[in-house]
């Protein structure tokens, strides 16, 4: 609020103590310059140009005998020739209880009776105990602490400003009434108006026929109205009756009773409804109810109505303590009208600290049938899940030792069009590892693992496996080069239960040593030409690397594959000792891998702007160990050539490519490319390409796909986003997403449609629609997680409120 002109001749300021702090008066004097004086605990600062009546009143004023009963005003006054003030600076007041807190008054003109009341005329202002009352006229009774104000009344307390034509209240007790008020909550940026507001006490108030919005006054796109709203500042909660949400001039939601928090603390009550649509289930409406059981426990019930299937009941219970935490979630759909059976799911994640270094955990997930995620999943993430883990275990760590004991099972979902074989279950697995670095320059590692494997498939080998692997290496790292010799001993013992008719050995022992030598050099140079092109100083590196590994051949064709698969062939795998995961296959090796990397690094920041790598492996003898156990159909001396490049030379531009090239057949076996341009916030364009050539040796299926995704502003407030993935082999889209976001100063609207192929050789379509009312709630089905998954670099737009002035909250 603009402060009235301080040069007004009648502008007066007064500070007076509480009635019970009055002291005996004494005579005072009047100075030509502004001075401070008091009458029975009342100080007044007046200018020399005061009216004659005001001057006479000031001349007869008296000062208190004790400075402790008053509060000083910062007023400039006359000084002696030596610079000492004629009016001495008053001591800092001692803290008083609320009933003894001083009051401050200011107005163009004031009058009143000593120790009884004061009348303010023209820009009246009263301050007491954190409350500010302003009005054209203001009357205040010191004995009753009662104030009445009329004309442009402003009441400010604890970050809340209430304005209206009149007000009557007890200032300290915050008891009173204001008619046709408007209010602003500066801490949350909300505002509204009402027919009446009653201040019940310091913590409670009641709003009659009130509204609330976070929109600017000249653009109220939405507001919430209610016949009655009760505010409890102590509990930081509000409640009301007959609430209606209006959006763009239309009522869109109503509730007979409601409650809401005044801060970020959790409160029990209904959450915003979630709306959606799925081609497999129809219209989808969820109305969650939240129970704030305790600060460390809560429960959410979420009944979900599916128009084509029925009513699904769901619940999620969360708990947390110093020694444990977890989440229990369950869903139940009785008598699904489409499937004609009950559908359900359950999930439990629990973590427990039993003692120092000793922890336990449970991760259990199960669904009623194989099509549950397709029919009832809310997004492509859940709809494509085909394996559910059911696991529990204990871990213990002390020093360099780590132990694990667990039982791990799986639920595998197979459909008529997607037949999946279940993996082996670990019932149980016991694992012990030891890691110690720099023991006289040596790094020591020891792994031992015992697992009993079981599988719910008939006529399939099962059994037990004991694996031990000590490793010792001696890294020699110097500026510009490194050499790391390593020795590994792989020892494995099997005891197998083979199906009837299988005559292979039931007990197998295997011991294989492995030696490797890893080495590399690093050269650096300045690049004045590149630095000139890009306007920055760059350093280029050249980093050649050689890696040799030797493992003798051992026939492993009789060993089953419990948990072993071919590692993905890439620049990380080509510099390792074994191309297989798990412990069931140890490849015979007599191989040398050569690679070279060059990097461009900004000299000042150390940011890597470009990296390019080439690598290839030379096989001196030809690997004979395969996953199938049979000898390979052909032996290759040279592996596929691997290349990779990452470039981010320009602001917001990123390019990455990987290539796998087979020299023997002169064919590209694998190629991936990714391009991203992100010039600014909420602006991104992504291009992607993936090509995999069919390979019988690795089981790789042919694949060729491309995709494009983007988020881009179409207007100042409207943003478009989308993605399309195209299968070039099938000549049809594999997945699509199209969406829009509209951002206003107090709300954001989001609409997205997603379509993807499902496990039954069809397509599933989801529609997401959400409106986010700033400072109130979100209504609809949140598409943000789905968009983030489909559009890399996506940033949700947020409401753009009018930037407040630094003086907006000044009273």
Curated annotation (Swiss-Prot):
Source organism: Ralstonia nicotianae (strain ATCC BAA-1114 / GMI1000) (Ralstonia solanacearum)
Compartment(s) of residence: Cell outer membrane
Source organism, top-level taxon: Bacteria
A GO cellular component entry from the record: cell outer membrane
Tagged with keyword Phosphoprotein: no
Region described as Disordered: 1-22
Chief location: membrane
UniProt-recorded name of the protein: LPS-assembly protein LptD
Summary of subunit composition and partner proteins: Component of the lipopolysaccharide transport and assembly complex. Interacts with LptE and LptA.
HAMAP family for this protein: LPS_assembly_LptD
Function according to Swiss-Prot or TrEMBL: Together with LptE, is involved in the assembly of lipopolysaccharide (LPS) at the surface of the outer membrane.
The keyword Signal belongs to this UniProt entry's keyword annotation: yes
Coiled-coil regions listed: none
Family: Belongs to the LptD family.
PANTHER family associated with the record: LPS-ASSEMBLY PROTEIN, LPS-ASSEMBLY PROTEIN LPTD
GO biological process, one term: Gram-negative-bacterium-type cell outer membrane assembly
Record InterPro entries: LipoPS_assembly_LptD, LptD, LptD_C
Keywords from the UniProt entry: Cell outer membrane, Membrane, Signal
Residues making up the signal peptide according to the UniProt record: 1-17
